[in-house]
Amino acid sequence: MKILFLSANEFEDVELIYPYHRLKEEGHEVYIASFEKGVITGKHGYSVKVDLTFDEVNPDEFDALVLPGGRAPERVRLNEKAVEIARKMFTEGKPVATICHGPQILISAGVLKGRKGTSYIGIRDDMINAGVEWIDREVVVDGNWVSSRHPGDLYAWMREFVKLLK
């Protein structure tokens, strides 16, 4: 499968790095998209190569989506093309994994009403206001959406996402 990550500078390092390598380990092709090509750097200094700009992404070419957290989603959600990519993939039922602040992009896409999910507690009210039944649990699976709260939930998050991809 081809899996797309949408992110930007100040991502939460382990929330991007762990799933990136975990999914590659499963044999998937993994791509990172951001505002421009080059590298993006996490909150703790880890840098990753950007494969595509948001404008270069054709969501029809990807099978699943990962939205890591940190401060990056606050920036990504302001990019109309990135939000449209997330909206299209989510509404088409493609597997989508979010953690921490990652759901902010889906909130901006307007696709979460009536869904069950979790996130970093700091955006709990935003999730509830978007129509999510917010659950304080390490991982919540609702159809094509797998959500988790923070780095302490990484193993459960990827365990459930990998199951969904099979």
UniProtKB/Swiss-Prot annotation:
Keyword Hydrolase in annotation: yes
Tell me if Protease is a UniProt keyword of this record.
yes
Q: Which family does it belong to?
A: Belongs to the peptidase C56 family.
Q: Please give the biological process terms from Gene Ontology that the record holds.
A: proteolysis
EC number of the protein: 3.5.1.124, 3.4.22.-
Name of the protein in question:
Deglycase PfpI
Keyword annotations for this protein?
Cytoplasm, Hydrolase, Protease
Q: How does it assemble?
A: Homooligomer. Exists in two functional species: the predominant form is a homohexamer that comprises about 90% of the total activity, and the minor form is trimeric.
Function as written in the Swiss-Prot or TrEMBL entry? Deglycase that catalyzes the deglycation of the Maillard adducts formed between amino groups of proteins and reactive carbonyl groups of glyoxals. Thus, functions as a protein deglycase that repairs methylglyoxal- and glyoxal-glycated proteins, and releases repaired proteins and lactate or glycolate, respectively. Deglycates cysteine, arginine and lysine residues in proteins, and thus reactivates these proteins by reversing glycation by glyoxals. Thus, was shown to afford full protection against glycation of thioredoxin by glyoxal.
Q: Which Pfam families match?
A: DJ-1_PfpI
Q: How does activity depend on pH?
A: Optimum pH is 6.3 for proteolytic activity with AAF-MCA as substrate.
Query: For this UniProt entry, what's an example GO CC term?
Result: cytoplasm
